[in-house]
């Protein structure tokens, strides 16, 4: 009899195949319903709950109580350990047997004392393979343990993913049984789903699309789910289709297993350790079953955690790394934020990361890997270069809210001209699942068609871990070379970039920062974290400098290398892109603040020890030692301690990177300089402060009505306007609360107005003049501020204390300037850049809120106004108004973010000429690195001493530290950078006993051709604009 005609109506045929593989419909008779065969419950199930994250050896000793499917456990952040005793039926010999496990929370299976696989419903891992084929002599009974964390892949938000965690959330075990798994059914399901994807993805205008649909339809015709003997016929139809290969010009997709794990975010740091174990042990299991599978893993910190907590797993990771399947990438300690960390902190990310990878895996990383961060500094290309990296992968700019970035593969040129090859996976994700839709998008979305014929495809569940699955691998292997689709190969990042480099002649170049047009609120959210970051960067800088000087001058001093490494790693951990940005839950923020407190406490102890060793043995009176940790001479007013806890103001002079003695506190007398500060309060309540350099006038409510550069009489405040104007905005983003501030918030501006008569004189003049006032921001929030002007100081400081209790409000302070310019300048890592002050294009107005470090400046020819700060990052200049972002009040994922008391200082500096010539850079450093008054040992040094100085103000000596390699060898590393944006030759003056000077890279590897000539304790150095140079100084043996 002739076969019935196939009518092949598109919709009915397509839906017929969909129902044949559906997990929801007709599972009693479709193919999906045959995925598992015979099943039986586990023999014995028992459990115990604990609020602790216990090691396996301790957990298995606890008292397990009977449990059953349907039981609830919790609450959030607790752990439920299950003991699962299994008996496999004799009738299952020759079959593949799985433990099927479905529970809320994230599970980890332990077998014979070692972790073997993660189990997470959200990560599509709900079964563990007990045996591929049950043998006649295989044991029928065994005991497993399943450690279930009471949190999901993405935390435990109450009502939404990014909401604050629900502390009372309960979790449930919904399935625990043994079942026979039909691998042949699984492979047929993979093929049918791929054919459906091709049919839908290529569309009705494509011949190959119909071939895919008709092949799938014919497979349904020949496949009887109840008769497995029909499966090979269907499989042959699929193989014939997928065996039809494409042409040589096909785009090649490099598929790399990936598992992005946020080091902390919607869960605490300690849970990340377990997420790593769950995800990576599953990846290793996949490597054993799929020798061609390659998995990329970043973040040295996470590997260090696993090494400490799971040594057996870590040994296996090293084994698979040797095979080339587990590939460490990134080169950094964590995937840090790309905006807020200082330049030196970014260097340390690579220094700690690359040294870890070299020590643990035998080689450094060749690719920088930062798929998920909130922008990318223009100095990153130079920092990468200095750390041996020329390749960079990320994808976050696909989140841009306004403009689509024009490239996926391109060269990125940094501030100094360094270039790196950059690739954004065109599928706009680092968590692909191997679907045809994603494969087609990777090609269709590629903005460099014709210039680059290779793309990355990162597959695996991510953010909260999870990683790849066997199903994803099966899909990608099936699509390796199929007509109508790009070629897919399982590949490593090194293979991808090598392919891109081999055909890079036509790639375009992007110059400057990679600005993310989203998440602008992260420059301001969680102000206490931002302050801790800035303070701890300073503390570690100062400890390293003083410890280095003590090492050079004292044979007995031991440089605290191990302690400093620990403190640096805490700081680098906090610079993870969801911690320093403030986009984390309350628990993480509190842990971060504890890390900062550890750095402050231990750092100050190390500082005192280094200072004591530095000046030991020099004759002089007891008293105070004033230390200057910056590379230029400073003359400043200091508040020095007196007996009884009081303070006395003194004008001190301290040389560059050195110290000066101060007489004992009892003899301190405030000596008036030739030009003291004058303070005058008018009858209307306004106050004028004048130090002969600048004259400051405040209205009776504390607003700045005039700021004059005395020598020229030039007014800095715009006519008819007032500065130091606090403004409040409504701050309700579209979704990402802690992350985003939207452009429309600018439409809600409300000036905060004070009451006349609240301004009062504080310090009445002489060495210092000040005035202070109170301001009620709202019924719930208030601030107090002291406006301070010191002798000889080119800027006026605003010491501010805020009691902040708001919801979805944004506090800023504005300074309208009598300056006109289309560009404003902002400090970034190791330099500065310009951004527009207008909204001409969409690229301009997308930058309505930007980031800066210690200063920003608005200048016209001959004059400018700089706004400095000691712990803020959010900023903007719109027209002629300089605005500093102070506080936000988001409610997710931390409902308490920014609530409470805050202290910070900002300063305003009018200047003649350019900001470079006026010393704005030095002034901002001085604001952030106050002189140190340390108790001098007895006897104290009698004279001043300077260790280093630089002949050019364009060059900043940023860092002095002991060299990392061979601590026994007395070597220092100095890091300098050109800060003005100029070519410059300069002399570095040394007062230390230096034996040899060699140029080195940022990883402190000497340049074979970099030996420098030391003449008269000076080194000549040559810089190009914004260039960072590192020197290795070998010290002479100290006198005994």
From Swiss-Prot:
Keywords, alphabetical: Cobalt, Cytoplasm, Glycosidase, Hydrolase, Metal-binding
Sample GO molecular function, one term: carbohydrate binding
UniProt keyword Hydrolase present: yes
Active site: 372 (nucleophile)
UniProt xrefs under Pfam families: Alpha-mann_mid, Ams1-like_1st, Glyco_hydro38C2, Glyco_hydro_38C, Glyco_hydro_38N
Family classification: Belongs to the glycosyl hydrolase 38 family.
Cofactor list: Co(2+)
Gene (UniProt): MAN2C1
Catalytic activity entry: Hydrolysis of terminal, non-reducing alpha-D-mannose residues in alpha-D-mannosides
Organism: Homo sapiens
Protein location: Cytoplasm
Function: Cleaves alpha 1,2-, alpha 1,3-, and alpha 1,6-linked mannose residues on cytoplasmic free oligosaccharides generated by N-glycoprotein degradation pathways.
Stated name of the protein: Alpha-mannosidase 2C1
Transmembrane segments: none
Binding residue positions for Co(2+): 260, 262, 372, 577
Entry EC no(s): 3.2.1.24
Main location: cytoplasm
């Amino acid at each position: 009899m002739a076969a019935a005609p196939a009518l092949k109506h598109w919709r009915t045929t397509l839906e017929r195949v969909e129902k044949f593989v559906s997990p929801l419909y007709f599972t009693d008779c479709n193919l999906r319903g045959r995925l598992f065969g015979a099943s039986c419950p586990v023999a014995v199930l028992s459990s115990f709950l604990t609020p602790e994250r216990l090691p396996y050896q301790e957990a298995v000793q606890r008292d397990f109580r009977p449990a059953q499917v349907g039981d609830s456990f919790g609450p959030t952040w607790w752990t439920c350990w299950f003991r699962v005793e299994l008996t496999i039926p004799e009738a299952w010999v020759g079959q593949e047997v799985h433990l099927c496990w479905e529970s809320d929370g994230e599970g980890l299976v332990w077998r014979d004392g070692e972790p073997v696989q993660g189990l997470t419903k959200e990560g599509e891992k709900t079964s563990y393979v007990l045996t591929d084929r049950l043998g006649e002599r295989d044991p029928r009974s065994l005991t497993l343990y399943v450690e279930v964390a009471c949190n999901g892949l993405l935390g435990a938000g109450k009502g939404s993913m990014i909401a604050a965690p629900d502390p009372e959330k309960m979790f449930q075990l919904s399935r625990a049984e043994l079942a026979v798994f039909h691998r042949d059914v699984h492979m047929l399901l993979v093929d049918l789903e791929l054919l459906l994807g091709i049919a839908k993805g290529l569309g009705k205008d494509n011949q190959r699309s119909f071939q895919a649909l008709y092949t799938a339809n014919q497979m349904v015709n020949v496949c009887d789910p109840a008769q497995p003997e029909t499966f090979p016929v269907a499989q042959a139809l699929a193989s014939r289709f997928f065996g039809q290969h494409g042409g040589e010009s096909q785009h090649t997709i490099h598929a790399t297993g990936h598992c992005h794990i946020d080091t902390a975010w919607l869960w605490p740091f300690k849970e990340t350790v377990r997420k790593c174990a769950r995800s990576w042990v599953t990846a290793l299991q996949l490597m054993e079953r799929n020798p061609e599978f390659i998995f990329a893993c970043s973040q040295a910190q996470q590997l260090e955690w696993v090494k400490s907590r799971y040594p057996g797993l870590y040994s296996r990771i090293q084994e698979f790394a040797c095979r080339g399947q587990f590939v460490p990438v990134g080169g950094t300690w964590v995937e840090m934020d790309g905006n807020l960390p200082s330049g030196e902190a970014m260097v340390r990310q690579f220094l700690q990361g690359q040294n870890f990878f070299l020590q643990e895996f035998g080689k450094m990383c060749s690719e920088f890997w930062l798929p998920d961060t909130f922008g990318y500094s223009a100095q990153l290309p130079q920092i990468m270069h200095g750390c041996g990296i020329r390749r960079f992968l990320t994808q976050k700019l696909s989140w841009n809210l306004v403009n689509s970035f024009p490239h996926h593969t391109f060269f990125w040129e940094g501030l100094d001209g360094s270039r790196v090859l950059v690739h954004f996976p065109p599928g706009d994700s680092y968590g692909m699942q191997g679907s045809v839709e994603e494969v087609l998008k990777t090609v269709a979305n590629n903005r460099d068609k014709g210039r680059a014929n290779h793309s990355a495809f990162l597959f695996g569940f991510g953010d909260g871990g999870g990683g790849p699955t066997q199903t994803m691998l099966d899909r990608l292997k099936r699509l390796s070379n199929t007509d109508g689709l790009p070629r897919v190969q399982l590949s490593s990042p090194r293979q991808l970039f090598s392919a891109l480099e081999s055909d890079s002649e036509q790639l375009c170049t992007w110059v400057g920062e990679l600005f993310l047009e989203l998440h602008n609120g992260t420059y301001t959210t969680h102000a206490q974290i931002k302050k801790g970051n800035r303070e701890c960067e300073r503390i570690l800088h100062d400890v390293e400098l003083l410890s280095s000087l003590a090492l050079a001058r004292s044979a007995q001093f031991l440089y605290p290398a191990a302690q400093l490494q620990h403190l640096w790693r805490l700081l680098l951990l906090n610079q993870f892109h969801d911690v320093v940005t403030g986009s984390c839950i309350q628990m993480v923020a509190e842990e971060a603040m504890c890390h900062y407190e550890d750095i402050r406490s231990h750092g100050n102890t190390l500082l005192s020890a280094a200072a004591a060793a530095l000046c030991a043995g020099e004759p002089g009176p007891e008293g105070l030692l004033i230390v200057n940790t910056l590379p230029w001479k400073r003359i400043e007013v200091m508040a020095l301690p007196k007996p009884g806890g009081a303070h006395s103001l003194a004008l001190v002079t301290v040389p560059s990177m050195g110290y000066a003695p101060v007489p004992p506190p009892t003899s301190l007398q405030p000596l008036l300089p030739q030009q003291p500060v004058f303070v005058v309060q008018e009858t209307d309540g306004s106050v004028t402060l004048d130090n002969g350099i600048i004259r400051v006038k405040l209205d009776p409510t504390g607003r700045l009505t005039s700021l004059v550069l005395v020598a020229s009489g030039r007014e800095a405040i715009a006519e008819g306007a007032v500065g130091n104007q606090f403004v409040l905005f409504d701050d309700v983003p579209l979704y990402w609360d802690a992350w985003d501030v939207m452009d429309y918030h600018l439409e809600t501006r409300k000036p905060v107005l004070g009451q006349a008569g609240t301004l009062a004189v504080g310090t009445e003049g002489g060495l210092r003049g000040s005035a202070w006032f109170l301001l009620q921001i709202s019924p719930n929030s208030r601030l107090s501020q002291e406006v301070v002007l010191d002798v000889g100081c080119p800027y006026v400081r605003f010491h501010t204390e805020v009691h902040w209790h708001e919801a979805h409000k944004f506090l800023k302070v504005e300074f309208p300037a009598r300056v006109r310019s289309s560009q404003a300048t902002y400090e970034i890592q190791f330099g500065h850049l310009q951004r527009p002050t207008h909204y001409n294009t969409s690229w301009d107005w997308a930058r309505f809120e930007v980031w800066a470090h210690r200063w920003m400046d608005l200048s016209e020819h001959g004059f400018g106004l700089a706004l400095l700060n000691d712990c803020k990052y959010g900023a903007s200049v719109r027209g002629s108004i300089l605005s500093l972002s102070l506080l936000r009040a988001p409610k997710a994922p931390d409902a308490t973010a920014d609530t409470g008391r805050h202290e910070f200082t900002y300063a305003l500096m009018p200047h003649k000429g350019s900001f470079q010539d006026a010393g704005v850079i030095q002034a901002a450093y001085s604001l952030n690195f106050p002189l140190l008054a340390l108790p001098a040992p007895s006897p104290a040094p009698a004279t001043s001493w300077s260790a280093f100085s630089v002949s050019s103000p364009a060059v900043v000596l940023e860092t002095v530290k002991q060299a990392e390699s061979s601590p026994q060898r007395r070597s220092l590393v100095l890091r300098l950078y050109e800060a003005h944006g100029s070519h410059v030759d300069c002399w570095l003056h040394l007062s230390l006993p230096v034996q040899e000077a060699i140029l080195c890279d940022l990883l402190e590897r000497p340049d074979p051709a970099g030996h420098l000539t030391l003449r008269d304790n000076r080194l000549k150095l040559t810089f190009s604009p914004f260039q960072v140079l590192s020197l290795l100084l070998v010290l002479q043996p100290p006198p005994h």
